[in-house]
């Protein structure tokens, strides 16, 4: 919407302000409007890049490089005097007793005469007394031609048992010689197994195979239409029970055959 004032110049509604005009109104998010199709402007002033939020610690002159890659020797504090070793009173007392001094009044003068008897430092004690590390065998110099470990050609019993007494040549591994040897051995075994001089051993049949073969042989037998054998005295006797020749049981009951009617007629007579 464009408003036309009396002067004839057009002005946008958002530029029209009523009342007091302040510069802070341009930074007020409640009054500022984003132009159409643009991002809303930032309404706060960023601090200068040199401003640091929070506490700024002092830079440590000794960084990671000085700690990990630079070796610094120990420097004694200048304000402290060098600590001198104290007198070895146990040794002085033994020496005084060996000299025939047995009273406490004679000990101060004896200690002044033997002021050089001091306690040994830890470095002096370790240097004088043999340690466990000093008893370990030393490695001979390389100029003597000594060999440490086992040579490259040595094969243990476990390696010999698993991979053979010798290492296979790299030439055979690259050229596939062992693969060709495996194929040749299998072809020789196949040719030896298919020879005519070897007798054929048929497989042993199981009970299931025998049962199937017997049923198939009975099924494939031709039908025998000959009259079944009977004794001469039974040839003139009629059958008492008819032979079931197929069909459903219900049909045989509802529609009996001629022989069944004859058998039913003779049943009450018996």
UniProtKB/Swiss-Prot annotation:
Gene Ontology CC entries for this record: motile cilium
Coiled coil stretches, renumbered: none
Compositional bias segments (type: Acidic residues): 258-270
InterPro entries (UniProt xref): CFAP77
Principal location class: other
Cleavable signal peptide: none
Keywords: Cell projection, Cilium, Flagellum
Subcellular location, record wording: Cell projection, Cilium, Flagellum
Keyword Cytoplasm: no
Record field: compositional bias (Polar residues): 128-145
Annotated region (Disordered), positions in chain: 128-148, 215-270
Reported function: Microtubule inner protein (MIP) part of the dynein-decorated doublet microtubules (DMTs) in cilia axoneme, which is required for motile cilia beating.
Family the UniProt entry places it in: Belongs to the CFAP77 family.
Protein name from the UniProt record: Cilia- and flagella-associated protein 77
Source organism (scientific name): Chlamydomonas reinhardtii
Gene behind the chain: CFAP77
